[in-house]
């Protein structure tokens, strides 16, 4: 296995994905699922920015194309915060959300996350 691949895999970080579903016209979220992905901070245009910010407003994730059915606009994530021990069906403390439809290309995909307003990190 190439050195490059090993590095990529090692850099993946853990986060929890909560898929959105609608019940009686209201948004709810499935139980958090632990996944491992790479993500990088960007500006609102999706251009990479330096890692200076602790809690970036936007993150770009490039999952494997085989994972394309996992991600949907409106899904929420716990990234810099842990999910609660008892599942919260509205994920009110989830710190990020997919804010536009994931872009799917032939052999890659891109998912844009936006920090949810009103959610603060501890520090």
Regions found by a protein language model. Give the residues of each.
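Active-site-proximal polar cores
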Residues: 1-26
């Amino acid at each position: 296995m190439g050195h490059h691949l090993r590095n990529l895999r090692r850099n993946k970080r853990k986060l929890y994905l909560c898929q959105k579903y609608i019940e009686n016209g209201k948004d709810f979220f499935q139980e958090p699922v632990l996944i491992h992905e790479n993500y990088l901070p960007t500006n609102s245009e999706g251009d990479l920015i330096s890692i200076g910010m602790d809690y970036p407003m936007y993150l770009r994730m490039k999952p494997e194309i085989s994972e394309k059915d996992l991600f949907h606009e409106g899904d929420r994530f716990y990234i810099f915060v842990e999910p609660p021990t008892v599942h919260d069906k509205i994920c009110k403390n989830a710190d990020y959300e997919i804010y536009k439809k994931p872009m799917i290309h032939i052999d890659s995909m891109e998912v844009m996350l936006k920090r949810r307003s009103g959610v603060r990190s501890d520090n």
